[in-house]
Amino acid sequence: GGYNCPIARSVVKDIHAQDLVDKKHYCGGYREYWQGVKGCEGDVGNIEIHFVDSANPGYFWLFPLGNGMVNVGIGMVLDLLDKQKTKLKKLQKDVIQNHPLFKDRFVDAVMVNGSGKGWQLPFGSPRKGEILQPRRMFSDGVLLVGDAASLVDPFSGEGIGNALVSGHIA
């Protein structure tokens, strides 16, 4: 499944002659699990989304998971990452160690070994062409859903809701 599945490749590349990955419409995401982040102790905590200059447009997040464990991550449009000649892992490390809102919160925190993971998210934003339009997600007898249809929200990076709705419609 997903944006790179054989069916999506066939619909997008072969039938509609569009690029499978357009870096202006894909976000890179990177996350790690951390223990002991100040303000995220115990089983209660708020989801935090922060817009930091080094990852703009994009954001840095803290998602408390319970028992003091936190999903810490960063996401940014791939095209802009390439222009900055940087990697999300490096950007995240810099935010954690140097940003005034976070460096004190991570002083005693410990990253869970092997928890770092990166991925790409296909945005449902308009593509190039005579008329800006979403990525082609259909053909005779075929309707792509979820990531295969590039239905990730370009603002939030969330796609589960759109995937469920598209599956229901299909």
Where are these regions (language model features)?
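Predominantly flavin-linked oxidoreductase catalytic cores and closely associated redox partners
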Residues: 1-108
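Generic helix-packing signal
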Residues: 12, 167-170
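FAD/FMN-dependent oxidoreductases across multiple families
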Residues: 80-168
